[in-house]
């Protein structure tokens, strides 16, 4: 099969599907219309599919094959964001937007599925197509990854479009691969502080949760600065601080939420433990009650080295000038990691930002946009890899 030629035949459909999905975003696990659209397309392609997992569509090419089983994954959910791109196919749904590229991921997997289905007689093996919900919640892959169905898979592949690599000198249209640790954990923590409220003019009568919160916020940065090697990438960030309702009242409580990003189980455990110890120690110092919780969301994305090398070889057959190896991990997280905890695989990137008003906007921004010119590269690489591995 001439993979690039076959993919180019479906490129117009790829863009059409992506635009339809972009106009009609859905959130989390509530993807009824998206799932219906995907399932109908798979039916058109003659691909067996089911919706037995919450918010997901699973398809199979050559389901009866006893050969090697490769899973291809695309996520489908959007974000609770009001779109401000001004694109002709902008979101039609108030307060919802595909601001992280999942519309493209879904369309790209459909394109790969269509081509592979048309050439299924040339394939000695089975292909599992995972159209996944709720990546943005960090939990959409768990049910599938833990299933008996997924346990039969030998390898799993996925990709992310967009501008996650902005600022690294990566050219548009680049296909970026990483061996080993590739993306960080996406953990969350909460800290609740209970002090004693008082009038703002009488701080001596208070146990001030705002002051205590400030000590906690600054002190936990010592975990990164003084307890972990500077060669080990670690992030501790606060995203929510809630306390008080009046300018002249010291409140009784404060609430903090944040995220940690790590790349190894050992550092993950250390950060989780020390966050709690520091918060509770500061609370004790200032006579406040502390409630601390740490939520382990997606683990690190750790690519299989051999599979990544084979994916790079496949990509170089099609786009020899566009393949780049990433030498440092990205501290963003991805629930694709739950698949990689179960089976070997690889997660790669397409760098395809589109400027709005002359600027490239970050993922999750209301003006985030992607260039469609390069979107065909992802299904092309997936199909080439499958044919290299399973082609007769």
PLM regions and their residue ranges:
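Acidic/His- and Gly-rich active-site-bordering loop/insert found
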Residues: 1-98, 107-124
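Histidine-centered active-site/metal-ligand motif
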Residues: 20-24, 98, 102-105, 160, ...
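Divalent metal-coordination and catalytic microenvironments
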Residues: 21, 59, 72, 102, ...
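Active-site beta-loop-alpha junctions enriched in small/polar residues
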Residues: 26, 75-77, 134-136, 162, ...
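Metal-dependent amide/peptide-bond hydrolase catalytic core
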Residues: 44, 214-392
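Non-cysteine beta-strand/loop elements that form the S-adenosyl-L-methionine
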Residues: 71-73, 189-191, 347-352
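Histidine/acidic-residue-rich, glycine-tolerant segments that coordinate divalent metal ions
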Residues: 79, 87-97, 104, 121-240, ...
């Amino acid at each position: 099969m001439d993979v690039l030629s076959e993919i180019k035949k479906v490129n117009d459909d790829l863009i059409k599907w992506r635009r339809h999905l972009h106009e009609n975003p859905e959130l989390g696990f509530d993807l009824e219309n998206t799932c219906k659209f995907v399932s109908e397309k798979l039916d058109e392609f003659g691909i067996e599919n089911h919706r037995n997992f919450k918010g997901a569509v699973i398809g199979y090419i050559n389901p009866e094959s006893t050969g090697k089983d490769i899973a291809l994954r695309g996520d489908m959910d959007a974000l609770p964001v009001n779109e401000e791109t001004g694109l002709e196919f902008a979101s039609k749904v108030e307060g919802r937007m595909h601001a992280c590229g999942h519309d493209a991921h879904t369309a790209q997997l459909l394109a790969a599925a269509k081509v592979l289905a048309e050439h299924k007689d040339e394939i000695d093996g089975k292909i599992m197509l995972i159209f996944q919900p709720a990546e943005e919640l960090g939990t959409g892959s768990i049910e599938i990854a833990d299933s008996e169905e997924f346990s039969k898979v030998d390898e799993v592949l996925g990709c992310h479009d967009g501008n996650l690599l902005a600022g690294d000198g990566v050219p548009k249209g680049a296909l970026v691969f990483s061996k080993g640790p590739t993306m960080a954990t996406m953990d969350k923590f909460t800290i609740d502080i209970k002090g004693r409220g008082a009038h703002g003019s009488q701080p001596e009568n208070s146990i001030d949760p705002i002051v205590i919160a400030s000590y906690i916020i600054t002190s936990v940065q010592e975990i990164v600065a003084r307890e972990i090697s500077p060669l080990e990438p670690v992030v501790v960030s606060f995203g929510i601080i809630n306390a008080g309702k009046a300018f002249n009242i010291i409140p009784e409580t404060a609430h903090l939420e944040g995220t940690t990003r790590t790349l190894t189980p050992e550092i993950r455990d250390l950060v989780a433990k020390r966050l709690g110890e520091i918060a509770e120690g500061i609370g004790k110092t200032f006579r406040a009650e502390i409630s601390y919780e740490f939520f382990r969301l997606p683990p690190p994305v750790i690519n299989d080295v051999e599979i990544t090398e084979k994916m790079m070889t496949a990509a170089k057959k099609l786009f020899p000038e566009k393949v780049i190896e990433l030498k440092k991990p990205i501290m963003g997280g991805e629930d694709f990691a739950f698949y990689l905890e179960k089976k070997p695989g690889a997660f790669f990137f397409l760098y395809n930002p589109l400027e709005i008003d002359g600027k490239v906007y970050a993922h999750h921004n209301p003006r985030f946009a992607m260039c469609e010119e390069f979107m065909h590269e992802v299904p092309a690489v997936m199909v080439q890899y499958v044919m290299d591995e399973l082609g007769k």
